[in-house]
Amino acid sequence: MRHYEIVFLVHPDQSEQVPGMIERYTGILTQAGGQIHRLEDWGRRQLAYPIIELHKAHYVLMNVETTAEAVEELETAFRFNDAVLRSMVMRTKAAITEASPMAKAKDERDTRRSSEERAPRAEATEEAEESAENTAE
């Protein structure tokens, strides 16, 4: 079996259907005896150039190990699904399992935001406790 990196873009109005699409497409690959090494849903992002007068699309990245026949079936499924704007399948030399730079950046942003949210909350609770102590005196 060969290793592939697959990226597909979904119409932004169909973002609610993306989990079902991912399930369907991973099912095609795993039924052929393939294995999913990495699956990342990047969400709705800005396009580099308009596609069918759209400026945003929902991005999904998969790194898989499967047969060439399964990849052909997947590409056919992409072609017949009108919600899939673009797709790209690249053969890779080895399985890629670590998080992509996009996912790493998102994780860093999320941790930064959560730590920033916790800090004001902690300050607010300290101020509330101090004001409660002052009113009690």
UniProtKB/Swiss-Prot annotation:
Bias (Acidic residues): 125-137
SUPFAM superfamilies attached to this UniProt entry:
Ribosomal protein S6
Q: Which residues form the signal peptide?
A: none
User: Which keywords describe this protein according to UniProt?
Assistant: Ribonucleoprotein, Ribosomal protein, RNA-binding, rRNA-binding
> Any one cellular component term from GO for this entry?
cytosolic small ribosomal subunit
Question: InterPro entries annotated for this entry?
Answer: Ribosomal_bS6, Ribosomal_bS6_sf, Ribosomal_S6_plastid/chlpt, Transl_elong_EF1B/ribsomal_bS6
- Name of the featured protein: Small ribosomal subunit protein bS6
Q: Which organism is it from?
A: Shewanella pealeana (strain ATCC 700345 / ANG-SQ1)
What gene is behind this protein? Answer: rpsF
